């Protein structure tokens, strides 16, 4: 009888161990965007780098495809602000180009019109959802007109990040 009890306990322990995810193989995921979506925008399989999350849940996700100076990159940074009315202006000052307001993305968002070369296209959106700010930067190697405006991909990414922050 004792032997059956031990066998039953051992079987239950093994079943529990086999059904739980392995700690060594667990991966942290970007809460704002998944790798498949980023890969679709960047044109292939991506590598994901994350900063450790803060107590408030702030996190930076960087998706990249390729290596070195020719890498395609998507950088998403999310920060919590103590005083959004004052602090958001500081984040907007990071905009290196002309600011164009964007409607229906979070509580407030702007496109930073950056200078594009004939081979590199860089787009940036800075937005706010309640007390959280997000900065989305997309770098791709394509021919882009300097006056092309915000690409549909970048707008969709900004909408998805803002939606995940609500």
Question: Which residues make up each language-model segment?
Answer:
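Bacterial N-terminal signal peptides
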Residues: 7-19
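Alpha-helical structural motif
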Residues: 10, 34, 84-87
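N-terminal "mature-domain start" segment
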Residues: 21-62, 142, 147, 151-166
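General secretory precursor processing signal
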Residues: 14, 25-28, 33, 64, ...
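A short, solvent-exposed beta-edge/loop patch
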Residues: 100-166
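Positively charged n-region of N-terminal signal peptides that target proteins for export
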Residues: 1-4
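Short, solvent-exposed recognition patches
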Residues: 41-120
């Amino acid at each position: 009888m004792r032997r059956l009890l031990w066998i039953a306990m051992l079987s239950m322990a093994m079943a529990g161990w086999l059904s739980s995810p392995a700690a060594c193989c667990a991966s942290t995921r970007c809460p704002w965007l998944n790798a498949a979506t980023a890969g679709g925008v960047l044109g292939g399989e991506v590598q994901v780098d994350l900063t450790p999350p803060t107590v408030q849940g702030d996190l930076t996700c960087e998706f990249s495809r390729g290596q070195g100076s020719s890498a395609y990159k998507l950088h998403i940074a999310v920060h919590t602000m103590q005083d959004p009315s004052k602090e958001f202006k500081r984040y907007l000052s990071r905009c290196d180009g002309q600011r164009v307001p964007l409607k229906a993305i979070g509580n407030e968002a702007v496109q930073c019109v950056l200078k594009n070369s004939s081979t590199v296209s860089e787009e940036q959106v800075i937005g706010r959802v309640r007390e959280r700010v997000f900065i989305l930067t997309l770098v791709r190697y394509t021919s882009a007109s300097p006056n092309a405006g915000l690409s549909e991909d970048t707008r969709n990414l900004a909408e998805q990040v803002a939606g995940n922050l609500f």
